[in-house]
Amino acid sequence: MAQRDIETVIDNVVGNKVIPASTRQDIIERTDGIPLFVEEMTKAVLEAGSEGAAQQRTIASFPSTALAVPASLQASLMARLDRLGAAKELAQVGAAIGREFSHALLSAVVSEPERTLASMLDRLIAAGLLFQQGVPPHSSYLFKHALVQDAAYGTLLREPRRALHARVAETLDVQFPEIAENQPELLAHHCTEAGLIEKAARLWGRAGQRSLERSALVEAVAQFTRALHQITSLPASPELRRDEIKFQIALIAPLIHVKGYGAPECKAAMDRARLLIQKAEALGEPPEDPMLLFQVLYGFCVASYVAFDGDMLGEFAVQFLGLAEKQRAPVPLMIGDRVMGAYLTGTGNLKQGQAHYDRAIALYEPS
């Protein structure tokens, strides 16, 4: 904003009060013309100046130390939060829940009497930190800006923060099962921040599957990746190894759609999936779904075909068809013959390739 616009914002916040010209100039210089910064800085200056003041005293009469402009927006917001008393703790709870939260969830997490809760919410709203929509207990609240939420959240120490996220996670799980079911990523986030890693991993995997079903492919990649990251931080167990294989293979399809078959990330994901299956088999823990390895090998086949890498396509086609013949599974046999046919015809072996295509057609069942 231009200086004239900045001064207009300051005037709107100050109202009929007066601040020294030097303080006004400090605000103008430190806020870089950012509207939120201007507004929050001015409010912080007014609140600092009005503490302990008699009603008739003007802001202009305060010494410069009382009207010191905070050095940053973060400092300004934190100073305003510190002056809210008990309402600051409510802001911290809200910040841990998210940028927007319902009255019902907030009330369940804080377990305060409704009158006390209403009083603290009124203070936050009056301070311009929260917006309210609707009437309690059916209302919802929104932090004025993400920076306000960040400032409130940033005042939490590590252990209280973890405990708060654990409380939110438990509340969602027990009292709001519909949210936990329909928004597993929300519950996963709180479990992650609470240090409930194993539970978080499975929830991120569930969230990834839901995103995949909705064709939200970028979100699915991020969520499956988070699930896998959580698992690798835990001590190994047969159950976690099964989950890791499942999530690693589930990651491949959305990753291919987002990055393309030839992307190194896709090859790395398929390599990792195949390695995990091989390790599980070596431990006597083969995947419960025998089709999982076929999914990985088929991904390699298509990636090789798209990259015009005949040698690699041939190698994976042989592996795929060999495994299908070993298991005598009709669908993998059909796909294996089709892949082998593509390899052979692509390398000039038309007669042999046609034989595999004929076998694939014979195995095909439209139903």
PLM feature segments, named:
Residues 4-222, 226-234, 276:
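Short secondary-structure boundary elements
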Residues 113-114, 131-132, 151-363:
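Inter-helical turn/loop elements of alpha-helical hairpins
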Residues 367:
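Phosphate/pyrophosphate-binding betaalpha-module
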